[in-house]
Amino acid sequence: SVGSPNEWYSRQARQLIQQRAAAGQDLTKAALKLMNTYRLTSSTPTALRAMWTLNAIGSADEDWLLEQSNDEREHIRTWSIKLLCDQEALSEKTQKRFIEMGAQDKAGLVQLQLASALQQLPLEDRWPLANALVSQDTFAKDPVFPLLVWYGINPAVTENRNAALKLVAQCKIPKVRQFIARRLAGEAGKE
């Protein structure tokens, strides 16, 4: 069973369910059981295993994953972001939820996952999420977070200088401000 405390059994169950899904078998009962396991467990690892399996068999749609982005457990919220990003292009409602989370969620893993999601957005759509992420200085000294934000907005900086300048004006992460200023100055020198 996916809910087994023994990781080997759980992994074998997930693999078998995924193989059946790939073979086109009807997994309605399995999906219901997985959903039940997800809802009833107090174990975060078990909930994640159920979530991953539901996603692998196509039973974790956008609406369900967006609901999970409100879960009290940081790892569940983080994985809901990751799985939403693994789907097709991010919808407007998913982007809005990411912006809300960027501004309000204080969990480090969630913030890192959102910063990494920047790279999956079209250039013009990156600014609202980037603004939300840099509006607080909680992770300013983190060795990874400022770089992830920068990697996400770097290609957009020269495409929209005004948005970049607005971001610099309200940015509370010195390293991101420095990178943007350096990039804009470098581009200005080429003109």
Per-region residue spans from a language model:
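Long, ordered, helix-rich scaffold segments
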Residues: 1-191
